[in-house]
Amino acid sequence: MTAKWEKLEGNEGVLTVDVESAKVDEALDKAFKKVVKKVNVPGFRKGKVPRKIFERQFGVEALYQDALDILLPEAYAAAIDETGIEPVDRPEIDIEQMEQGNNLIFKATVTVKPEVQLGDYKGLEFEEKDTTVSDEDVEQELKSLQERQAELVVVEEEAIQEGDTAVLDFEGFVDGEAFEGGKAENYSLEIGSGQFIPGFEDQLVGLKAGEEKDVEVTFPEEYHAEELAGKPATFKVKIHDVKRKELPELDDEFAKDVDEEVESLDELKKKLREKLEKDRAHEADHEKRDTLIQKASENATIDIPEAMINTELDRMTQEFEQRLQMQGMNLEMYFQFSGQTQEQLREQMKEDAEKRVRVNLTLEAIANQENLEASDEDVEKELEKMAEMYQRSVDEIKSIFATQGGTDGIKADLKIQKAVDFLVEHSKAVS
């Protein structure tokens, strides 16, 4: 077999493939063995028709499509290996010659991975972020812990304040008619949380348990239920209970309740400071890397094929659906709730998809330019991390990857990570 690659404009080209006649005849034999099981010829049992009789009645051409189905995938894959091109979409195949006793000749119009013209990627600047943790930061974190440990206590004869939780019944009406989903009993609503329509919670401030009120609001214009969007509504509300947060004392006992590993409030404060310092250092490092990656990709010149963007959109849509499933939803439910279509969702994601593709192509080009590769030892360490994370043995993790085509994906990801590390090592901090 021979293969010739001819580059056209943009990211397209034509792959001309010539497959020897022996391979064609071999594929025709396989095709006959498959097809003969399905044909009926008078005087012969199904599957027992001689080849010559079959060709006399149906013609050898009846085998061509099945033979092509056998030949093309293998020949196309071999041609890609021979020419070293990197297709990013399905090819358009044009059969130029296909007949018994002769070579198969076909042309494949292929969209390939684009060439990347790197711009500046060494010496890129990033803003040094202050990661200092102050005493006030620690106190704020301590206050948040105190808030989370607070108990809701019913307050008798006291009016609702901001931050209180009201236990209430409500029923909503638009144009004097009750609407679906507008009614609840014994609903707990934290005042100021913004759970309800703007203006609803504010009008409950000052009410006491046992009191009733008509709350007048207007649904937002962008409200998800179109039949209610922009319309004024009246909610009949009855307050059952008013609950207020009762904060625990900030003392050693509180510290031990929050964290079993500490014995005093001072120890807890020290631990909180260390965690804040670690978190801020991690956040600063993430921002630095993100800044450098974005600058390097913006400096590169790339003509990105639409096919690569569409593939990334498919991946992003799948990731989005997985997040929805974690919340007990699926795409169909999301579209119904949001009023969006799949086309609108993809259009909304398209800019981010293009950025992702641009970033990956840029980092891959930097890795190639700087001869950065992931070693077998790097892959082994990554597998060990995965084994620890999922509490499995390394051999089990390897077996899983073996069923999925091996660890080439890990090696490619590590190569990209080395490119990011390279950007960091060759960057400049500015204040």
UniProtKB/Swiss-Prot annotation:
Compartment annotation: Cytoplasm
InterPro entries linked to this entry: PPIase_dom_sf, PPIase_FKBP_dom, Trig_fac, Trigger_fac_C, Trigger_fac_C_sf, Trigger_fac_ribosome-bd_bac, Trigger_fac_ribosome-bd_sf, Trigger_fact/SurA_dom_sf
Family membership: Belongs to the FKBP-type PPIase family. Tig subfamily.
Catalysed transformations (reactions): [protein]-peptidylproline (omega=180) = [protein]-peptidylproline (omega=0)
Official protein name in the record: Trigger factor
UniProt domain comment: Consists of 3 domains; the N-terminus binds the ribosome, the middle domain has PPIase activity, while the C-terminus has intrinsic chaperone activity on its own.
SUPFAM superfamilies registered for this protein in UniProt: FKBP-like, Triger factor/SurA peptide-binding domain-like, Trigger factor ribosome-binding domain
Location, primary (coarse class): cytoplasm
HAMAP family: Trigger_factor_Tig (MF_00303)
Gene that this sequence comes from: tig
Biological role: Involved in protein export. Acts as a chaperone by maintaining the newly synthesized protein in an open conformation. Functions as a peptidyl-prolyl cis-trans isomerase.
Keywords, in A-Z order: Cell cycle, Cell division, Chaperone, Cytoplasm, Isomerase, Rotamase
Residue span(s) of domain PPIase FKBP-type: 163-248
GO CC list: cytoplasm
Record GO terms (molecular function): peptidyl-prolyl cis-trans isomerase activity; protein folding chaperone; ribosome binding
GO BP annotations, alphabetical order: 'de novo' cotranslational protein folding; cell division; chaperone-mediated protein folding; protein transport; protein unfolding
Gene3D superfamilies given in the database record: 3.10.50.40, Trigger factor ribosome-binding domain, Trigger factor, C-terminal domain
Keyword Cell division attributed: yes
EC number per UniProt: 5.2.1.8
Main EC class the enzyme belongs to: isomerase
